[in-house]
Regions:
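Small beta-barrel nucleic-acid-binding modules, primarily SNase/OB-fold domains
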Residues: 2-156
Length: 156
């Protein structure tokens, strides 16, 4: 029980009767599928060149630990059979780490469900820098809008 006095309840009841019922609005199905943001997050670890684990703070006093895949890019895979791709994956991971080092928090924008359970897809900013754009500019990521991913030939 929040309090012993009926006065607050009576006040809000009389306000409702005087002003009439408030209009209730509900989110549409598409609104439930994404969060415009920004959502403040602290980076826990860099997983690879396009995925990070963060503690996101969608509401005051609450944190959600989640993997975030950067929207619009793809980087080489760490678990590739090709040694050249594994080396490129490490370079991409190092670049992502460099881009976010020194920022105590980042912002997640346009957060939506990812392709795989437990991962969300989002745009990310560290300061004023868009991280996906910076990864593309580095040459260590390629544009990716979903669907079949590019698989380079293995030279060795």
């Amino acid at each position: 029980m929040c309090g012993d006095s009926p006065i607050p309840f009576v006040f809000f009841l009389s306000l409702g009767l005087t002003c009439g019922p408030a209009k209730t609005t509900y989110a549409t199905d598409s609104q439930w599928r994404s969060i415009a943001g920004p959502v403040t997050a602290q980076i826990i670890r860099i997983i690879d060149g396009d995925t990070l684990e963060v503690d996101a703070h969608p509401w005051p006093g609450h944190a959600v630990r989640v993997s975030v895949r950067l929207r619009g890019i793809d980087t080489p895979e760490r678990r590739s059979r090709c040694a050249g791709q594994r080396a490129a994956a490490q370079l991409a991971r190092n670049e992502l780490e460099r881009l976010v080092t020194g920022f105590s928090t980042v912002e997640l924008i346009n957060v939506s469900g990812g392709k795989y359970y437990g991962c969300v897809l989002a745009d990310m900013k560290a300061g004023k820098r868009d991280i996906a754009s910076a990864m593309l500019a580095s040459g260590l990521a390629r544009p990716y809008q979903g669907g079949k991913r590019h698989k380079p030939e293995c030279a060795g």
